[in-house]
């Protein structure tokens, strides 16, 4: 099925490499979190939500591995230890939910004080408008926390895009290369999986979504990873959202 012939009721978008450049995430957001995590923890260490995040971080299996790497492991959990562990997780690109939650809080400060603006590709706002006008819902599924997702779209270079978005999903619903995650999303959206179109840059995510019954298209944005020949043969590939501007709702047979 070509892009121009597709119908759907929901467009489910990934962020990194799909709506937003990978370089923004890796070259702007991650370094900002690394640079500011220790100060943020010192400022809010006694707040209940931070205490809960710290407790969750201590339960991450990699926490013991990280402490074993230290020449002089501390006898108690303090700001410096947790900040170092978060920087370690970021460097390893490990998508750990409490770390993502903490990153989201740090980024919230950056967006609020104007130090950060969310990058979106120039074709994204027009696509969002077209899909909404056609009656489709738009949802987001990213490994970044829901809070972080809302910040990117709420403080984007194109302004506040949140009014276009009806739902957000992160790793609380499951990991992105697992079929069950997409089944969970379809259930939460109360939608037939085949009426959901998932847009991503990762073949493993597209395969997991398709195995759950969703439609899936892979974005080949500048800077995205190259694809093997079998991956190119398995999925429809598009360079941006423009081929999908005419996406429509399925025809209601009772009205046809």
UniProtKB/Swiss-Prot annotation:
Catalytic activity: 5-methylsulfanyl-2,3-dioxopentyl phosphate + H2O = 1,2-dihydroxy-5-(methylsulfanyl)pent-1-en-3-one + phosphate
GO cellular component terms, semicolon-separated: cytoplasm; nucleus
The protein, known as: Enolase-phosphatase E1
Pathway linked to the protein: Amino-acid biosynthesis; L-methionine biosynthesis via salvage pathway; L-methionine from S-methyl-5-thio-alpha-D-ribose 1-phosphate: step 3/6; Amino-acid biosynthesis; L-methionine biosynthesis via salvage pathway; L-methionine from S-methyl-5-thio-alpha-D-ribose 1-phosphate: step 4/6
Organism of this sequence: Drosophila simulans
Chief location of this protein within or outside the cell: cytoplasm
Requisite cofactors: Mg(2+)
Native organism taxonomy: Eukaryota, Metazoa, Ecdysozoa, Arthropoda, Hexapoda
Cellular localization per UniProt: Cytoplasm; Nucleus
Residues binding Mg(2+), per UniProt: 14, 16, 201
Function: Bifunctional enzyme that catalyzes the enolization of 2,3-diketo-5-methylthiopentyl-1-phosphate (DK-MTP-1-P) into the intermediate 2-hydroxy-3-keto-5-methylthiopentenyl-1-phosphate (HK-MTPenyl-1-P), which is then dephosphorylated to form the acireductone 1,2-dihydroxy-3-keto-5-methylthiopentene (DHK-MTPene).
Assembly behavior: Monomer.
UniProt entry tagged with the keyword Ribonucleoprotein: no
Cofactor note: Binds 1 Mg(2+) ion per subunit.
SUPFAM superfamilies membership: HAD-like
InterPro entries attached to this UniProt entry: Enolase-ppase_E1, ENOPH1_eukaryotes, HAD-like_sf, HAD-SF_hydro_IA, HAD_sf
Family membership: Belongs to the HAD-like hydrolase superfamily. MasA/MtnC family.
Keyword Transmembrane tagged: no
Pfam families for this protein: Hydrolase
Keyword line: Amino-acid biosynthesis, Cytoplasm, Hydrolase, Magnesium, Metal-binding, Methionine biosynthesis, Nucleus
Chain residues that bind substrate: 142-143, 176
Gene Ontology molecular-function annotations: acireductone synthase activity; magnesium ion binding
GO BP, sorted A to Z: L-methionine salvage from methylthioadenosine
EC number: 3.1.3.77
């Amino acid at each position: 099925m070509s892009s121009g012939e597709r119908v759907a009721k929901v467009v489910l978008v990934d962020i990194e490499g799909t709506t937003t450049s990978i370089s923004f995430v890796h070259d702007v957001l991650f370094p900002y979190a690394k640079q500011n995590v220790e100060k943020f923890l010192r400022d809010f260490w006694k707040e209940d939500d931070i205490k809960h995040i710290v407790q969750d971080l201590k339960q991450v299996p990699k926490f013991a591995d990280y402490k074993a790497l230290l020449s002089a492991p501390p006898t108690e959990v303090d700001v410096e230890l947790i900040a170092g562990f978060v920087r370690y997780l970021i460097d390893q690109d490990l998508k750990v939910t409490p770390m993502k939650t903490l990153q989201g809080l740090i980024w919230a400060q950056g967006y609020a004080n104007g130090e950060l603006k969310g990058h979106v590709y120039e074709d994204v706002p027009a696509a969002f408008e077209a899909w909404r006008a056609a009656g489709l819902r738009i949802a987001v599924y990213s490994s970044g926390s829901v809070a972080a997702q809302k910040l990117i779209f709420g403080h984007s270079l194109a302004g506040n895009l949140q009014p276009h978005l009806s739902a957000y999903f992160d790793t609380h619903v499951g990991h992105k290369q697992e079929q069950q995650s997409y089944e969970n999303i379809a259930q939460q959206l109360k939608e037939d999986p085949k009426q959901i179109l998932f847009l991503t840059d990762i073949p493993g995510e597209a395969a997991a979504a398709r195995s759950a019954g969703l439609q899936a298209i892979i974005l080949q944005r500048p800077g995205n990873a190259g694809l093997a020949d079998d991956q190119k043969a398995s999925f429809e590939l598009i360079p941006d959202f423009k081929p999908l501007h005419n996406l429509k709702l399925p025809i209601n047979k009772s009205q046809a």
